[in-house]
Amino acid sequence: MNPHHYGLILAGGRGTRFWPRSRKRSAKQVLDVAGERSLIQATVARLAPVIPPQRMWILTNEYLRRTIIRQLPEVPQNQVLAEPVPRNTAPAIGLAAHILRSLDPDAVMGVFPSDHVVRKPAVYRTVLRAALKAAAAGNLLVVGIQPRWPETGYGYIEFPRGTKPGAAQALPVRRFHEKPELANAKRYLAAGNFYWNSGMFFWRADVLLDQLRRHLPRTASVLASLPRFGSRRFAGALKQAFPLCENISIDYAVIEKAAHVSGIAAGDFGWNDVGSWNAVYELLPHDACGNVTAPSSICLDAHNNFVDARGKLVALLGVRDLIVVDTPDALLVAARDEAQRVGEIVKALEKRERHDLL
């Protein structure tokens, strides 16, 4: 393992599309929605053969920090940082780069979502090693994943024409595209050189900080003013300074403005961003009628349903394509094809000031 390679796992999201199980203090990334381990535990385990937990850093919030520390005893506690206020991904990544640059001038960092699933980890780690190697040479690097269908829920990375998946070398990125309409998604799929944006980034810490100084100077100045990580003044200074950072994603702040961005056009490593309960349904094994539910459930003339109701017997009769998620204080019943809208329920609860259900 290269001692200059570090991992930053972003774990501050609320996962509102996974209500009612996902709450402020038990968000999607710390839930076991797609297996026996939580999503963040699976992420750390997947990275560990390339980046050991001792060199992993986690950015989260005050609500989740203790839970993450409890779930990941292998990660040093002082490397699980809580943002004082949410400021999107650019300040969070900039903060980690600032700390890593101060600890290791040659630090190369990979930035990873905490809540994705990878079904082919060996293939994934091959991509990871290639990305870290390319980033060490000074590249800003993204990972694109070969699309398997015309997805409208992902952004796309446009590579040069003729790009083939699975190559280990870094390629120039021609352009980034926002989440498309279906017609454009079909065109991207047919073209063959448009890849899903995985949300994974790789760069030297000093290269990223230089880009922040160019494109986000206020945030760069705020971060540069912080005392050395580990000093007595660091926590208090961070609490005062971090709210002064711009609220902006790393994509808009740096990646889409940088003069040169490279990418790896990855093949299929079984990636899924697990963006909704329906995505969980697609991931888990089904019974003969297409249902995902506990073995004790009773399903009569019921097809293609997803049920998460732990500790209760569930009986389904004459229904299809439903999502049912039960918790002690809330019950969700939704059509599977409306799963992306579950976050609207959270907004409705916020308007009603039902903080007990958030």
Regions found by a protein language model. Name each.
Residues 86-91, 149-151, 182-184, 271:
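A short acidic, often aromatic-flanked loop/helix-cap motif at beta-alpha or helix-coil junctions
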Residues 1-9, 16-27, 32-123, 129, ...:
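Conserved N-terminal catalytic core of the sugar/cofactor nucleotidyltransferase
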Residues 120-242, 262, 336:
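Conserved core of the sugar-phosphate nucleotidyltransferase
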Residues 35, 45, 49-52, 73, ...:
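Generic secondary-structure signature for well-ordered alpha-helical cores
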Residues 1-4, 205-358:
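Left-handed beta-helix
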Residues 40, 96, 115, 157, ...:
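Residue-level signal for inorganic ion chemistry
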Residues 3-6, 53-54, 76-77, 104-107, ...:
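Short coil/turn connectors at secondary-structure junctions
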Residues 109, 174, 193, 200-201, ...:
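A residue-level structural signature of the nucleotidyltransferase/glycosyltransferase Rossmann-like core
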